[in-house]
Every structure is written in C-alpha cells, then in structure tokens.
C-alpha cells in the first residue's frame, strides 16, 4: 500500500516519501510521462513500471508484510502478488537512498507535466 511505501522510504532513505517524492520530476507522484529527469526520477519511473507488471492485486491499496533483518527490508507473506508489490517498493526505497546525492528539489520539485512531453516517454 502507499502507506507502507512511505514507511519503507522512511526506513531505508530516512526521508518522507510524501514530502520528498510525491511531486518530483516527471514520474514521482501520480501518473508520469516524458523522460525521467535525473536518477531519482528514474527510480520513480522504474517503480511505476514495476507496479504496471503486478497483476491480481492493487499496488496502491493492498497491504503486504515485511520485516527488518540486519538493517535490510525483507518482503514476506504467502501472497506472491503482495510480495511483488513489496519488492517494487523496497527497490524504489533503496534507489532513493542510493541517489540522495543528486536529488535536486530546486530544479525538479513541482516540475509539472508541461516539462514532460508525452512524445518523449520511454517504454518500460
């Protein structure tokens, strides 16, 4: 679920997903089009693609199970679909953490769809 995604971002990247990633670049937040603008925006693009491959459950609403082991997030549970959602969220949170050094809110926060032409969109 989106609430769990926020939790994973806080645990892994030590940032609030809502405040740092909900309206960044062309892909962080609802929807997405155009070219990813930087490494962080690419994290969101890849996350969107990951969610797009999930079938049989709702990535934004369905609750999955995870645990922390030796500082790492481990996705669990018996439902393969929900585990897949967790793996998408886990990978994005790690990607955010690994790209904090190039995060540029002055340039890409509230970037706007007008700067993300649909015709420049790339396939997953």
From Swiss-Prot:
Taxonomic lineage: Eukaryota, Metazoa, Chordata, Craniata, Vertebrata
GO cellular component: extracellular region
Catalytic activity field: a 1,2-diacyl-sn-glycero-3-phosphocholine + H2O = a 1-acyl-sn-glycero-3-phosphocholine + a fatty acid + H(+)
Disulfides per UniProt: 26-116, 28-44, 43-95, 49-124, 50-88, 57-81, 75-86
GO biological process: arachidonate secretion; lipid catabolic process; negative regulation of T cell proliferation; phospholipid metabolic process
The UniProt record lists the keyword Hydrolase: yes
Active site: residue positions: 47, 89
Stored SUPFAM superfamilies: Phospholipase A2, PLA2
Pfam annotation, one family: Phospholip_A2_1
Name listed for the protein in its UniProt record: Acidic phospholipase A2
Known tissue expression: Expressed by the venom gland.
Species annotation: Gloydius ussuriensis
Binding of Ca(2+), residues: 27, 29, 31, 48
SMART domains to which the protein is assigned, alphabetical: PA2c
UniProt main location, coarse: secreted
